[in-house]
Amino acid sequence: MNVSVEAKNIGKVVQIIGPVLDVEFSADQMPNIYNAIVVEGENLAGTKVSVTCEVQQLLGDHCVRAVSMSATDGLMRGMDVVDTGAPLTVPVGTSTLGRIFNVLGEPVDNLGDVSNEGGLPIHRPAPLFVDLDTQLSIFKTGIKVVDLLAPYRRGGKIGLFGGAGVGKTVLIMELINNIAKAHGGVSVFGGVGERTREGNDLYAEMKESKVINEDNLSESKVALVYGQMNEPPGARMRVGLTALTMAEYFRDINKQDVLLFIDNIFRFVQAGSEVSALLGRMPSAVGYQPTLATEMGGLQERITSTKDGSITSIQAVYVPADDLTDPAPATTFAHLDATTVLSRNLAAKGIYPAVDPLDSTSTMLQPQTLGEEHYGCAQAVKTTLQRYKELQDIIAILGLDELSDEDRLVVARARKIERFLSQPFFVAEVFTGSPGKYVSLSETIQGFSQILTGELDDLPEQSFYLVGNLDEAIAKAATLG
């Protein structure tokens, strides 16, 4: 973040406790809450240090308490502190595409500076009610299982649940690819408090699948903002807002549809809890910060559709000790419009995307929103899969032959549906060799309707595996002949 203050308001560090600093200013020049202040000076080794902090409390006696956005190693009492007079300001616009930033909006990919003309502050009000787009509309992803059974709302929030190695990253990259191709939109990825290795792997995979175009960065489809788990709590608490601010520019100024990924929303709450304890606030339920709902609401309310464009957010949700009643996931659930649950059992069967069709949910799955045809097809698919699930114990013990003719037909159709829910991805072409498929909603509904009515009972179930629409399944059946 560039600091250019003509009449510098300078204070002095009076106390340092880990990532928390107390700074004294003159009585008539106290900085505002959320102002960025920068500690400048030399440490004992003679090395220049510059640490940006954010004002959190006004203590009295002309002192403020601030939380550091980077390590406070080498800082000493008596060092000069410059009040920038504004909140943290980060670069926005097309120059951010294909780049990796830290919480301060500084590029960390060794590809040179980014122009910060007209950067935006990370603390901004949510859109006014009169500016919101209140029309319920589906955000079409081109992914069959999502569009049919747990459709995303345009401008909504989606929770992504899944353990390690079940295909979260590939699903995220496919969504980034599809929004760029089908909606002319862009994506912003906020890595909040996760592993550095995962961030590096994601960057490498994005370059390999051309989501990030190394030869021409402006043709990239995503901007990345990272605050890893080794960063101070202040950085992890604010990196989500940095990513959101970049996304808001694409929505409000460029009038685009934007996908905002937050991985992981739990780490945002966790960092807020650490900061709250460092500031001496009384903890609330299970040791979380008393302002948990306010902080979560402040972030989530800015993620919405306006009359200009939309931000649709997909948030990975870590559930501590698998306890869904923990205040962090429980507060997150209140804001979600849909959940996409990834299943290890489906991944083990080789069915990708491994989205669990029975556990994934959406508030959009209503006949008045989707239309009778879509809703009826989705419910029939779920009913068939549920019946198959109930019959699996019987099949395991007695075998298929002991089922009634009706149940055998249900099982055969359910197995076809299960395989037809798989799909080759564009971003997976490099390691599967199969060309990716974007399947329109009408083709998806048509395909599943025909499986349910029995029109395709004579096709082998293998012909439905890893294909796009129904025509491809029929063509594949001819080759299996």
Curated annotation (Swiss-Prot):
The record lists ATP as bound by 162-169
Q: Which UniProt keywords apply?
A: ATP synthesis, ATP-binding, CF(1), Chloroplast, Hydrogen ion transport, Ion transport, Membrane, Nucleotide-binding, Plastid, Thylakoid, Translocase, Transport
Question: So what does this thing catalyse?
Answer: ATP + H2O + 4 H(+)(in) = ADP + phosphate + 5 H(+)(out)
Question: Which Gene Ontology terms of cellular component type are present?
Answer: chloroplast thylakoid membrane; mitochondrion; proton-transporting ATP synthase complex
CDD domains in the cross-refs: ATP-synt_F1_beta_C, ATP-synt_F1_beta_N, F1-ATPase_beta_CD
Query: Per its record, what are the GO molecular function terms?
Result: ATP binding; ATP hydrolysis activity; proton-transporting ATP synthase activity, rotational mechanism
Chief location category? plastid
Cited InterPro entries: AAA+_ATPase, ATP-synt_VA_C, ATP_synth_F1_bsu, ATPase_a/bsu_AS, ATPase_alpha/beta_chains, ATPase_F1/V1/A1_a/bsu_N, ATPase_F1/V1/A1_a/bsu_N_sf, ATPase_F1/V1/A1_a/bsu_nucl-bd
What EC number(s) are associated with this protein in UniProt? 7.1.2.2
Tell me the protein's name.
ATP synthase subunit beta, chloroplastic
Q: Which organism is it from?
A: Oltmannsiellopsis viridis (Marine flagellate)
